[in-house]
């Protein structure tokens, strides 16, 4: 298991501005990741060092947005003004994770504007709707990982997460913490995040400078 990507939400009307702003801050160009037809969302991705990437995602005016957990989570965050949605861990085998959740992972895919398709399985998205501090889990089924799309100069150095219990309510607390090689977690009280648990900010190292994205 390893930290795969971090996900930030913007509204459909604001996503272009957010992509330009964050891309400038981290000195990295985003690419149009295309539409998630199954989830009713669209994303842009920026490659990061260490095989990770940053996703900016928005909800679409589409029935799938309200019909799927990921679409619901993105729409809810967008309606609240946007910001950090979640962190995502990848594994080459989700069987053990599926066993603990008591259900199978859902299939996901998206087609980029150039026609290439990405496929994966994901699980744990239902839980992040009410518990923003929890990550979800993904298994990639294709090799064209978004971290390979362009030049990477930024790396994740710290996650600031509002959670008094420090993931004590997660089945995967130990696995998550051991997978965060080179990434610090700063735990803060939910009161500092308007009472909500979840990611407050992400600190990235860009050309030896620290950049904080709230």
Tell what function each PLM region has.
Residues 1-4, 8-29, 41, 47-214:
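Glyoxalase I/VOC metalloenzyme domain signal
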Residues 36-39:
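A short beta-turn/loop motif at secondary-structure boundaries
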């Amino acid at each position: 298991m390893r930290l795969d990507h971090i996900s930030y939400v913007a509204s459909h009307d604001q996503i272009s501005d957010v992509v330009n702003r964050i891309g400038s801050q981290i000195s990295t160009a985003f690419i149009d990741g295309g539409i998630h037809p199954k989830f009713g969302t669209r994303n842009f991705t920026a490659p990061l060092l260490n095989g990770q990437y940053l996703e900016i995602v928005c909800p679409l005016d589409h029935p799938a947005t309200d019909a799927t957990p990921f679409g619901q989570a993105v729409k809810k965050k967008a309606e609240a003004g946007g910001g950090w949605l979640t962190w995502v861990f990848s594994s080459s085998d989700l069987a053990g994770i599926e066993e603990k959740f008591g259900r199978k992972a859902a299939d996901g895919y998206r087609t980029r504007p150039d026609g290439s398709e990405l496929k994966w399985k994901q699980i744990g998205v239902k839980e992040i709707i009410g518990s923003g501090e929890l990550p979800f889990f993904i298994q990639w089924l294709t090799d064209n990982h978004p971290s390979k799309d362009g030049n990477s100069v930024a790396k994740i150095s710290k996650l600031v997460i509002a959670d008094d219990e420090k993931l004590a309510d997660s089945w995967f607390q130990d696995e998550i913490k051991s997978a965060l090689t080179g990434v610090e977690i700063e735990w803060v009280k939910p009161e500092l995040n308007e009472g909500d648990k979840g990611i407050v900010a992400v600190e990235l190292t860009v050309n030896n400078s620290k950049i904080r994205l709230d």
